[in-house]
Amino acid sequence: MNTQQLAKLRTFVPEMRRVRQIHFVGIGGAGMGGIAEVLANEGYQISGSDLAPNAVTQQLTDLGAQIYFNHRPENISDASVVVVSSAIAADNPEIVAAKEVRIPVIQRAEMLAELMRFRHGIAIAGTHGKTTTTAMVASIYAEAGLDPTFVNGGLVKAAGVHARLGCSRYLIAEADESDASFLHLQPMVAIITNIEADHMDTYQGDFENLKQTFINFLHNLPFYGRAVMCIDDPVIRELLPRVGRQITTYGFSDDADLRITDYRQDGARGSFTFTRQEKADLRVELNAPGRHNALNAVAAIAVATEEGINDESILQAMLQFQGTGRRFDDLGHYDLVNVNGKTGEVMLVDDYGHHPTEVDATIKAARAGWPDKRLVMVFQPHRYTRTRDLYDDFANVLSGVDVLLMLDVYPAGEAPIPGADSRSLCRTIRGRGKVDPILVPDMETLPATLAQVLQDNDLVLMQGAGTVGKIARKLADSRLQPQPGEGRHG
């Protein structure tokens, strides 16, 4: 970014004159790294710490950030402010050291709110679909030449980054309800994709508390702001009378302000008619599979239409949409002959979905786009608490595939909970009689175990939010071939 562009940007961003260096604890996370990347491009000195290098830390290092792969008090010695994610414990030595010398310690969302304060903020919230919808909004605005800043929780494939600094007044950001930190944000426009029970430890196990928090978030909009909400979602429909702001509804429902009709899917592409008030219908070709992605697209189109973006830019952005990282990510087609000696090929897909609703949407998209394929899912449950709280839902949804390989629960720092483990879940699914799960407690044996079950024309879904994404990449790199030393699961 040149000096003239940076000077233009400063008209939208507070200069924080006394801030010398901004330190991020847990900087390798997508959300944290995205904000750090925007601030680095704005000219601020960035430092941060994490336990191991990854693509995010490498990107930041290339931008001049100082990254430490440890957590030590001396790492924050030059910091003016310390930014932390909800995943970082309060007894982290860097947080303790910062508080001892009175360096401000703030949440990630507080820094995002600072970026948004002097911009036209568009915040995308909801239990599912936030990351993809954020990328879709950013894609439309970029196609229209509006050069937005965006901060996303996942990789925006077209840009190759999680976040990007633009020169316009628009800031498009994923808003995280997992720790209720999205209440720091004060956007001009807010999208709510859906509301379901998740992260309930944040809300004391009280769903009413979660619903009220979403209402409070919407009331951060100015009175002239707008809420764009999916009326297909029963909880959103219930909450509409409590939202004291201008509302645009969207969905497949007949009473939606902006409706989806005549949805069709062919492979990884969807198409639908977008019906709107006071304007002609649009036939949208969407380069993303599934009815859930049609809903994400219409949310993005609703915001763009409200802003006055022309139909040509909207249609082109949706046609060329490249998706986000680990959202029905097609990793390729692989010949079986070197995998297990059989003829034919299989398709490998990686997907981040880890809530039953998300997993169900992925399965339905796969069934609709590839109806002749057998679905083979490798599923890694994420968190013991989520497995416990949504146990029956997981059992129901996972019974919808043809072959199921189950990895152990990815704990995300949680202690095991009796009865909320993968072995118990396999037993329950097996008892329902639709699929006979294969438990794979040792991930080293997965390639060999998977090779044993694969057949011609299979679609393999690598599903979950833990380490299963890295496993998917390794499988793709090896072309699904078990490597020497990898045992077979008996």
UniProtKB/Swiss-Prot annotation:
Its EC number is 6.3.2.8. Pfam families: Mur_ligase, Mur_ligase_C, Mur_ligase_M. ATP binds at G126, T127, H128, G129, K130, T131, T132. This is UDP-N-acetylmuramate--L-alanine ligase. One of its GO terms (biological process) is peptidoglycan biosynthetic process. Cell wall formation. InterPro entries: Mur-like_cat_sf, Mur_ligase_C, Mur_ligase_C_dom_sf, Mur_ligase_cen, Mur_ligase_N, MurCDEF_pg_biosynth, UDP-N-AcMur_Ala_ligase_MurC. It catalyses: UDP-N-acetyl-alpha-D-muramate + L-alanine + ATP = UDP-N-acetyl-alpha-D-muramoyl-L-alanine + ADP + phosphate + H(+). It is an enzyme of class 6 (ligase). GO terms for molecular function: ATP binding; UDP-N-acetylmuramate-L-alanine ligase activity. Belongs to the MurCDEF family. The lineage of its organism: Bacteria, Pseudomonadati, Pseudomonadota, Gammaproteobacteria, Enterobacterales. SUPFAM superfamilies: MurCD N-terminal domain, MurD-like peptide ligases, catalytic domain, MurD-like peptide ligases, peptide-binding domain. One of its GO terms (cellular component) is cytoplasm. Coiled coil: none annotated. It is found in: Cytoplasm. It comes from Sodalis glossinidius (strain morsitans). It comes from the Bacteria.
